[in-house]
Structure formats: structure tokens, C-alpha cells
């Protein structure tokens, strides 16, 4: 926690960009500090696919999870991806 605010990292497939934004907004209004993904490779952010970038972003996401008090999994229709 930071002061009285729970820190939550969002996890899930970047296919669901709109759902990430919806959940981020809701949790923020509930008084949480929300950490989310910075790019949505499956939703149009082509920079993700440059050599080395995807690996860096995956590692950064793990560090975001390390910083959080808890995670929130965005699981649209039960989809969890191929990994």
C-alpha cells in the first residue's frame, strides 16, 4: 500500500484494450493506485513487435506485479491467451 491506497496491477491479454481502460477507471475511482500495461500489441501498438521490445515489456510487467499489493486479471470470455 502507498499511504492508504491499495496498489493493483492489471493483467490479461492486450487484445482487450477497452476493458483495461474500463477496469483502470473503476478501480481508480474506488481509491486504488492502478498499474497497467503501457502498450497494447494485440490492439494496434506495432512498436511492441520490434526486436527486443516484447521481451523488455514482459519483464517490466513482472516488475509491475512485484510492486503491487494484488493483481486484477482481465479475463474476457475466459480468454487467458496462449502462454
Where are these regions (language model features)?
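Conserved catalytic or regulatory cores that recognize and/or transform ribose-phosphate-containing ligands
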Residues: 1-83
Amino acid at each position: 500500500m502507498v499511504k492508504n491506497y491499495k496498489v493493483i496491477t492489471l493483467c490479461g491479454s492486450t487484445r482487450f484494450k477497452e476493458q483495461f481502460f474500463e477496469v483502470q477507471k473503476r478501480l481508480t475511482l474506488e481509491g486504488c493506485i492502478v498499474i497497467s500495461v503501457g502498450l497494447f500489441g494485440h490492439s494496434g501498438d506495432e512498436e511492441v513487435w520490434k526486436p527486443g521490445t516484447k521481451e523488455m515489456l514482459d519483464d517490466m510487467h513482472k516488475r509491475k506485479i512485484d510492486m503491487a499489493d494484488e493483481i486484477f486479471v482481465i479475463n474476457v470470455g475466459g480468454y487467458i491467451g496462449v502462454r
